[in-house]
């Protein structure tokens, strides 16, 4: 399916993405502070189980446990020598889960997160960052990824390098920013607005643009509206389950699955072609969105 276009994917209407992965890993025993991507090699059954839980909840698209699998991030966990293996296996595990869907086609987009290095401060060169993305995405393609999502982006320059790396390898790519900074909480950490981010993503060659994380799903209607004003690319929206609160030392989110689903429908009505969940969401939230979409 690596030769498909997003228009083929969207022929039957909006597509449902998966939800959060981190808390699902913690439920399965991932220690706080441990790097989840290492589980692709150390605990693959748990990784596949999380992916399968979203397939069973009704996701049309699931991601991969590769968000922090660039050479820069893995070096912090003494795993830089396992880049290819971790990325390839992460995709393979999601593909295995997707293949178990009954009577429908579930696609897999490989997750590519920020490198953690600062281009603006001269920590590394753009060429080094681009090469790191090519290295990561090559392994994801080898694992069978149907495309890539460059997510939780704050730096449009880094995002553009990742998009161009994916396109150089012939893959579909979604560019997704996180807008929770600034006086109005509507900019990325590096100051990009939804409009400027969407324009930069389109110029870099992204097949779809959007947002994930940062704030609750209820704030994503505005992000949709602002991006629609400047781009005709399909919109990808993956919001959090409301606002986080500390309860007995643990972070909990204040949204219910039903409330989340109602907000997700508003995001779709505003023009989103892809909708799902991020922090605080789980398979119950995605199942609720599935039911709401099917009942329209």
Each predicted region: which residue ranges?
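Domain-level signal for soluble alpha/beta catalytic cores
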Residues: 1-296
